Amino acid sequence: MVKIAHIHMSGCTGCLISLTDTYEKLLDILGSVELVYALTLTGEKTEITETDDKILIERDIPGGIDIALVEGSVCLDDHHSMDDILTTRKNSKKSLVALGACAASGGVTRFRRVGQMSQPSHASFVPIGDVIKVDLALPGCPPSTESIVKLLTAALEGDMEYLEPFAEIAKYGKDACGCDVIKEVINKSLCMGCGTCAAACQVNAIDMVEAKPNINSEFCIKCGICSAQCPRVRFPEIIRKLE
């Protein structure tokens, strides 16, 4: 039986909530796999040490994981986070999935400049691909329930044709947060005005003005959905290869 684990890093748990919102479809998936680790869902064994200034949580991440779903970014200031993400990569035999914007491209955690209570020393966050090799990345804040189910189903069935775009997104990490749409498409006049980015944006940060996208930086949360949906975001790279 396929072993699946959900590893929670620095995130809001929104991606896991999106996964559990699938209800019957989630039950179908869980009926065909073995959920070996999911701290939030199953209350896995942890060792908690509390001191005057911090709370330390030691997680027992099992080995032999077939599909690891990693939610949240990595805190570079926390050696426990670093240990957990390295252990997850070592214990994942097949696919490691960056689930959601924080894991895939850094998301809103990249806006952090100083630490906050209750962990004031935690100030530096990066997407997990900056630390380990990521096989698949599913952007969104959070990803839609349907997209999570389809990705998991394809991974279980070994549908590499369906998974290929997610493997491609995983290669770009923080560059695929939506900034690449501005830099590689809009600024280079490659946009064809299809409006797919505006339709996909989860926070309505993109307006179509005279058939061209106008991105409101005050609303944008760097979720990467527009990058994943844009049909021309990789055109400049293809052109460079041809040249």
From Swiss-Prot:
Keyword entries, A-Z: 4Fe-4S, Electron transport, Iron, Iron-sulfur, Metal-binding, Oxidoreductase, Repeat, Transport
SUPFAM superfamilies, per the entry: HydA/Nqo6-like
Tagged with keyword NADP: no
Chemical reaction(s) catalysed: oxidized coenzyme F420-(gamma-L-Glu)(n) + H2 + H(+) = reduced coenzyme F420-(gamma-L-Glu)(n)
Every 4Fe-4S ferredoxin-type domain range: 182-210, 211-241
InterPro entries linked: 4Fe4S_Fe-S-bd (IPR017896), 4Fe4S_Fe_S_CS (IPR017900), Coenz_F420_hydrogenase_gsu (IPR017681), Hydrogenase_assoc-protein (IPR051349), NADH_UbQ_OxRdtase-like_20kDa (IPR006137), NiFe_Hase_small_N_sf (IPR037024)
EC code: 1.12.98.1
Molecular functions per Gene Ontology: 4 iron, 4 sulfur cluster binding; coenzyme F420 hydrogenase activity; flavin adenine dinucleotide binding; nickel cation binding
Chain positions recorded as [4Fe-4S] cluster 1 binding sites: 191, 194, 197, 230
Positions bound to [4Fe-4S] cluster 2: 201, 220, 223, 226
Class of this enzyme: oxidoreductase
Keyword Metal-binding: yes
Cofactor(s) needed: Ni(2+); iron-sulfur cluster; FAD
Family classification: Belongs to the FrhG family.
PANTHER family referenced in this protein's UniProt entry, alphabetically: COENZYME F420-REDUCING HYDROGENASE, GAMMA SUBUNIT, F420-NON-REDUCING HYDROGENASE VHU SUBUNIT G
Role of this protein: Reduces the physiological low-potential two-electron acceptor coenzyme F420, and the artificial one-electron acceptor methylviologen.
Subunit structure comment from the entry: Complex of alpha, beta and gamma subunits.
Protein known as: Coenzyme F420 hydrogenase subunit gamma
Organism name: Methanococcus voltae
